[in-house]
UniProtKB/Swiss-Prot annotation:
This is CCA-adding enzyme. Keywords: ATP-binding, Magnesium, Metal-binding, Nucleotide-binding, Nucleotidyltransferase, RNA repair, RNA-binding, Transferase, tRNA processing. The keyword Metal-binding applies. Its EC number is 2.7.7.72. Catalyzes the addition and repair of the essential 3'-terminal CCA sequence in tRNAs without using a nucleic acid template. Adds these three nucleotides in the order of C, C, and A to the tRNA nucleotide-73, using CTP and ATP as substrates and producing inorganic pyrophosphate. tRNA 3'-terminal CCA addition is required both for tRNA processing and repair. Also involved in tRNA surveillance by mediating tandem CCA addition to generate a CCACCA at the 3' terminus of unstable tRNAs. While stable tRNAs receive only 3'-terminal CCA, unstable tRNAs are marked with CCACCA and rapidly degraded. GO terms for molecular function: ATP binding; CCA tRNA nucleotidyltransferase activity; magnesium ion binding; tRNA binding. CTP binds at residues 32, 35, 116, 159, 162, 165, 168. The gene is cca. Belongs to the tRNA nucleotidyltransferase/poly(A) polymerase family. Bacterial CCA-adding enzyme type 3 subfamily.
């Protein structure tokens, strides 16, 4: 197959390949960028593989960075862009089931492509636009298949994270997992426990917020991968609802909120669950806010003060979450009520703590408590948001 109409991300990099070729070496675009080109997907950047050794690349280009030179990768700075260029290589000895103990540079593109994870990622393209396909990646693209290169078990022993990448690609591309590859995941799912939680989390999130997440999540459950991640062991029955949902979460926060709801975790367990997954404090707070507000609107109509405390972002996330779970909720009414609030944050209130101190409220915890009482009164329409009304309120409540 020859591609003649290349997008700018490729044409901008062509001079880099040509310069390597002119120096007497092979160079190709490889991996996900070639796959996404063939699928007409957005391409963020390109990866380049070459027969040239790292020191030879450094001689060809003036500006380089030793990104991972021991493993054959040099970053070339060219025309304001950076390109990762990696020498053809083979790998061996994966004692940690993640990184190779030994890397050997080779001169053969086919040997380099053999170490790739899936056939659709083992494609290469030269400066002439010809696609090189040694493992029927083009056929698997046509069939919408995720298939391991060579023997799947070997690929997963080399890097156990590839099992999560398989279900992630399923979800993102809305492809099917090839049966032998799926069987190899089922047989080796325990290896996932060797991988850092952060890396698993990143793949899980990408899987969970992609359009094909329901089918991918079913494989995630069926193969036993779910048993190897934080907080999911023995919870298959709880999580089995996910593949039956009509919609996927579109944000990371809603994905975690959905997991917490499906797992039936009480609010006090949310922090420990989020920390097990190595989430940030900001994400933990955001998810806790969504779950708390979701529980509230599931049990009663929220007050104006509830809407104020939640904020528009949490309200919108809760509406999306209810939609995903098929729960009836008048989302537009909630948003309209929020937009009509007399104040939406502390700065909207015409007074602050200094005003209270000037009006005879003694310094201490009472100042903060009284501010909240005033906000509630303003939000519920008991008083107007002006100094005169608030002063009168103070005279009656202080």
């Amino acid at each position: 197959m020859k591609i003649t109409n290349l997008p700018e991300v490729f044409t901008a990099a062509l001079p880099v390949l040509k310069r390597i070729n002119e120096a007497g070496y092979e160079a190709y675009f490889v991996g996900g960028s070639v796959r996404d080109l063939l699928l007409n997907r957005h391409i963020h950047d390109v990866d380049i593989a070459t027969s040239a050794y790292p020191m030879e690349i450094k001689q060809i280009f003036k500006k380089t960075i030793d990104t991972g030179i021991k493993h054959g990768t040099v970053t070339v700075l060219y025309e304001g862009e950076s390109y990762e260029i990696t020498t053809f290589r083979t790998e061996s000895g994966y004692q940690d089931f993640r990184r190779p103990d030994h890397v050997t540079f080779v001169q053969n593109l086919s040997e380099d492509l053999k170490r790739r994870d899936f056939t659709i990622n083992a494609l290469a393209m030269g400066v002439d636009g010809n696609v090189i396909d040694h493992f029927d990646g083009l056929g698997d693209l046509d069939k919408h298949l995720i298939r391991a290169v060579g023997k799947a078990e070997n690929r997963f022993h080399e890097d156990a994270l590839r099992m999560m990448r398989a279900v992630r690609f399923m979800s993102q591309l809305q492809f099917t997992l090839e049966p032998e590859t799926e069987r190899a995941i089922s047989d080796n799912h325990e290896l996932l426990s060797k991988i850092s939680v952060e890396r698993i989390r990143d793949e899980f999130v990408k899987m969970g917020i992609a359009p094909g997440s329901q089918k991918a999540f079913q494989i995630f459950l069926d193969t036993g991968l779910s048993e190897e991640v934080p907080g999911f062991k023995g919870k298959k029955d709880n999580l089995a609802l996910y593949p039956q949902l009509n919609f996927s979460p579109t944000t990371e926060a809603n994905l975690w909120a959905l997991m917490i709801i499906l797992l039936k975790l009480p609010n006090e367990k949310i922090p420990s669950f989020m920390r097990m997954w190595k989430n940030s404090n900001a994400m933990e707070r955001q998810v806790a806010d969504i779950v708390t507000f979701f529980d509230l609107v599931s049990s009663r109509a929220p007050s104006n003060y509830d809407l104020y405390q939640a904020g528009l972002e949490t309200i919108a996330s809760t509406i999306d979450l209810a939609h995903i779970l098929g729960q009836p909720i008048n989302g537009s009414a909630l948003v309209d009520r929020y937009e009509a609030l007399p104040i939406k944050n502390n700065h909207d209130l015409v007074i602050d703590g200094h005003f209270l101190l000037k009006n005879g409220v003694p310094a201490g915890p009472r100042v903060g408590l009284l501010l909240e009482e005033i906000k509630k009164a303003v939000l519920e329409g008991v008083i107007s948001n002006n100094e005169a009304a608030i002063t009168e309120f103070l005279s009656l409540n202080n």
